Amino acid sequence: MANITTQGYHDEVTFPMIVRGTPPATLRGVLTLSTCSNVCLLTDYPFSVTPTVQNADFAHDYARAMGKIPLRSGLTDSLDVGYRPGELVVTATRAAGWSSPGLYLDTIDDVDFAKPRLRVEGDRLQATVPVTDSWGEKAPDLRNKSLTLVLADGAIAQEST
């Protein structure tokens, strides 16, 4: 299908878990993810994890996994989001500059976000995102709608609403 843009993770995903209380002998569940090529489909992945005794590497491994969760602050010095019909504009500054920026947007009902166009000028990142309705036609009105986004630069990410 033409004009479909997908975003997300590639090659590796980490899901840190905290089990409170006495852990079961085996933790089982089903993880449902959308997998995409030309079309996105929901796929169920049954899993089974046998809890192990914490070894010397546990604290390091746990801290590493938790470090991959987007922060609430700390990546950007300032963040501004604006909207004009058909276009979302995200502007962020970062004193350390931008080396490998990325922008990921949560979905909003009946709104499609196209692939962001990123432009870096020194410590300033500007992302322009074309916006259409679910049919790829008219631009919806995003005023007064809540939007959650993740800005990333390399291994550091920040989630903002």
Please provide the spans of the model-predicted regions.
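Extracellular/lumen-exposed scaffold segments
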Residues: 1-161
